[in-house]
């Protein structure tokens, strides 16, 4: 267990993506910013792949305070993890739930649906095992046993339109 390695870099992949891949006219990145963003982006992807290949746990996260990161789109992290690191949808879901809980030291409380654990889960319209983008359309969110039916977060259509092409 390497406490300093917990939550390895997926958040940096997300923060670097606009600088690395967006048209500079959209991101406002200079040529140097774009070059550096690409180095960071590629480095984080390679680090995550190497960690996975060597049995080192990788967690998923995002940083809502950063440009192009919203409070409602953590599901994108799973899609990017699948696309850029080559993991299965099932492994991406496992990483975002039980693995993250274990890395955070709360795997005995949450992260999976088991007797005695907090009732924290979502219900989607479609099966995320088939397509992780199904996580975008929530029917139900349950947190500590409290249900929110048909949650309707205020979406930033501009950010969604800019990021959606990088899902496929």
Task: Tell where the protein language model's regions lie, with residue ranges.
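Single conserved hydrophobic/aromatic residue that forms the stacking wall/gate
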Residues: 1-12
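Active-site gating loops and adjacent loop-to-helix segments of metal-dependent hydrolytic enzymes
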Residues: 10-41
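A cross-family glycoside hydrolase active-site/sugar-binding cleft signature
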Residues: 14-16, 61-63, 141
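His/Asp/Glu-enriched, well-ordered alpha-helical/loop segment
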Residues: 29-33, 40-127, 147
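Small/polar (Gly/Ser/Thr/Ala-rich) solvent-exposed segments
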Residues: 130
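Short, compositionally biased
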Residues: 134-142
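Short peripheral tails and domain-boundary helices/loops at the edges of structured domains
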Residues: 141-155
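Glycine- and charge-enriched low-complexity intrinsically disordered segments
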Residues: 155-168
